[in-house]
């Protein structure tokens, strides 16, 4: 397996190019280019440009994050979209995603459970109380069978009857018939993460293909649902593959990109990998914003471990404009109230429900 490359400041500064006198942290040429191309013109960075941003030294990190924040404000506005997620069916998945504790193929401590309708409704109500506009129902499956589709139909109808919130879904690889049914049920947005770039995907998953995932996303878009597609950074990919991943997502043009930071799970093949250094994670946020200037870029799993409170604040002022509140699928998040308080401290408004419809 390859390991992530973190290049020293002296090397990355030369690769990125700078303007100014020697010995100073002059603005790198790539950031000057991005200011014109992305901030002023709204055009995303290409692969080579995104790679240069990812190779910037730490001395340019604050300048990168400031530019990414300006891009986010200009092309997305200042509001932050909040979302809650709930696992309808946890554990026992037949797939071998090497990062995932829900795989039934690994000796992980996650046990297989299912929630009932009453639990889903209560979770949706609690999510709505935080100001969140999205509630995503997730199931640990390769793709849904008829029983799961019927459960989804009952759950969606029950939530819609009692809670004023958009419903999203993430239940794996779909057929055209299943896509059409979810659309009819009122699913607002469908999540199916690529997880990593195409070239690294075979190192992460072997039980299904990249093309199966992208095929589902194309059907979702064609059906008129919003596409939510992101992944995990820090799973051993190289910095070049991280740039490739940003462009893979750019080519899909999703509404939302959830950005997870690798959090090693006991019993999985990736259990011994180290989490990303905080500055690498922040640099990734800035680079992804410059490659995806108009997308919702959402803080997802792993931010508590990788970034902490200070890093999360820097991310929200460095390109992030959406967050998952509460817990994740197999890891603890943090109380939603803390995220609401943080947004207030940063003077970032929460996106209203009517702004998402």
UniProtKB/Swiss-Prot annotation:
Organism of provenance: Corynebacterium jeikeium (strain K411)
Residues engaged in binding [4Fe-4S] cluster: 93, 97, 100
EC numbers: 2.8.1.6
Pathway: Cofactor biosynthesis; biotin biosynthesis; biotin from 7,8-diaminononanoate: step 2/2
HAMAP family in the cross-refs: BioB (MF_01694)
Residues at which [2Fe-2S] cluster binds: 136, 228, 298
Annotated function: Catalyzes the conversion of dethiobiotin (DTB) to biotin by the insertion of a sulfur atom into dethiobiotin via a radical-based mechanism.
Primary enzyme class: transferase
Pfam families per record: BATS, Radical_SAM
GO function terms (MF aspect): 2 iron, 2 sulfur cluster binding; 4 iron, 4 sulfur cluster binding; biotin synthase activity; iron ion binding
UniProt record, GO biological process: biotin biosynthetic process
Record keywords: 2Fe-2S, 4Fe-4S, Biotin biosynthesis, Iron, Iron-sulfur, Metal-binding, S-adenosyl-L-methionine, Transferase
Region Disordered, residue ranges: 1-27
Family: Belongs to the radical SAM superfamily. Biotin synthase family.
Region forming the signal peptide: none
Cofactor entry: [4Fe-4S] cluster; [2Fe-2S] cluster
Gene that this sequence comes from: bioB
Cofactor note: Binds 1 [4Fe-4S] cluster. The cluster is coordinated with 3 cysteines and an exchangeable S-adenosyl-L-methionine.
Source domain of life: Bacteria
Catalytic activity: (4R,5S)-dethiobiotin + (sulfur carrier)-SH + 2 reduced [2Fe-2S]-[ferredoxin] + 2 S-adenosyl-L-methionine = (sulfur carrier)-H + biotin + 2 5'-deoxyadenosine + 2 L-methionine + 2 oxidized [2Fe-2S]-[ferredoxin]
Regions of compositional bias (Low complexity) in chain numbering: 9-27
Chain ranges of the Radical SAM core domain: 78-303
Protein name stated in the entry: Biotin synthase
């Amino acid at each position: 397996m390859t390991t992530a490359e973190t290049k020293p400041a002296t090397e990355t500064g030369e690769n990125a190019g700078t303007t100014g006198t020697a010995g100073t942290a002059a603005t790198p040429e790539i950031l000057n280019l991005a200011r014109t191309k992305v901030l002023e013109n709204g055009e995303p960075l290409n692969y080579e440009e995104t790679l240069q941003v990812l190779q910037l030294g730490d001395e340019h990190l604050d300048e990168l994050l400031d530019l990414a924040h300006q891009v986010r404000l200009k092309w997305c506005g200042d509001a932050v979209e909040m979302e809650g997620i709930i696992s309808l069916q946890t554990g026992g998945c037949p797939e071998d995603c090497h990062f995932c504790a829900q795989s039934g193929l690994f000796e992980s401590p996650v046990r297989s459970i299912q929630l009932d309708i009453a639990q889903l409704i209560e979770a949706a109500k609690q999510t709505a109380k935080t100001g969140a506009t999205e509630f995503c129902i997730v199931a640990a499956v390769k793709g849904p069978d008829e029983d799961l589709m019927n459960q989804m139909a009952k759950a969606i109808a029950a939530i819609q009857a009692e809670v004023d919130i958009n419903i999203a879904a993430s239940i794996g690889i779909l057929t055209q018939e299943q896509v059409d049914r979810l659309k009819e049920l009122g699913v607002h947005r469908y999540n199916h993460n690529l997880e990593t770039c195409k070239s690294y995907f075979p190192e992460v998953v072997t039980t299904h293909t990249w093309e199966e995932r992208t095929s589902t996303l194309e059907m979702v878009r064609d059906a008129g649902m919003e596409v939510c597609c992101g992944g995990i950074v820090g799973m051993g990919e190289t910095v070049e593959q991280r740039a490739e991943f940003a462009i893979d997502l750019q080519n899909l043009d999703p509404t939302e990109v959830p950005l997870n930071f690798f959090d090693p799970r006991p019993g999985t093949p990736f259990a011994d990998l180290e989490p990303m250094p905080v500055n690498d994670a922040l640099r990734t946020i800035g680079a992804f914003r410059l490659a995806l200037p108009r997308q919702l870029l959402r803080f997802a799993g792993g931010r508590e471990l990788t970034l902490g409170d200070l890093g999360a604040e820097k991310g929200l002022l460095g390109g992030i404009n959406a967050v998952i509140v509460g817990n994740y699928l197999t890891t603890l998040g943090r109380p939603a109230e803390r995220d609401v308080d943080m947004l207030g401290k940063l003077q970032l408004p929460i996106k209203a429900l009517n702004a998402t419809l």
